[in-house]
A protein has these predicted regions:
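A structural signal for small-residue-enriched, beta-sheet-centric alpha/beta enzyme cores
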Residues: 1-166
Length: 166
């Protein structure tokens, strides 16, 4: 594919290029998930999907949620603590007051415009106990989207990293 030795030529414009691009994105996404799942002591995988109008802002918010130790430990414990998600995203976006943030966890709305909404707590608690949990962030605007994958922060992770020296 890279060397050109196969003799296959794909025109940059057209259906073949589109199909090849889609297949490549699917392959790279699967590889990224494998890397995350192979993390030290990882038990669960989180996926943050952020949608809104500013791609840079979405990336900042999604990465802040994915990198938050509190969100990672909530994921590990199967805790649908959406306040940790709001804190991580809001803390990464200073000057957005109050943060016009919508949050869904596993498709269940828990926060709209920065405020709690009524939801089925037992259904949400059951939904976050799976091996993969999706967190959706909605920020002002439309048209852009980003996704970030992350692993939970487990007791095993702490033990593995505390037991060796460099």
């Amino acid at each position: 594919m890279c060397s050109g030795e196969s003799g296959v030529r794909v025109a940059p414009d057209g259906e073949d290029a589109d199909r090849m691009g889609e297949a490549l994105v699917e392959l790279l996404r699967a590889l990224a998930l494998m890397v995350v799942a192979d993390g030290e002591g990882a038990r669960r995988i989180g996926r943050v999907v952020a949608r809104g109008g500013n791609p840079a802002t979405l990336e900042i918010a999604a990465r802040a949620v994915a990198n938050s130790p509190l969100v990672k430990t909530a994921l590990h414990g199967g805790d649908p603590n959406w306040g940790r998600i709001a804190q991580a995203a809001g803390g990464a976006l200073p000057g957005t007051a109050p943060l016009a943030l919508d949050i869904d966890i596993e498709g269940i709305a828990v926060c709209r415009a920065g405020a709690a909404v009524a939801y089925d707590e037992p259904a949400l608690a059951a939904a976050v106990r799976g091996e993969e949990v999706e967190y959706e962030l909605g920020l002002p605007g439309a048209g852009a989207e980003t996704e970030v994958f992350f692993a939970d922060l487990s007791h095993d992770y702490v033990s593995l990293n505390a037991e060796y020296t460099t």
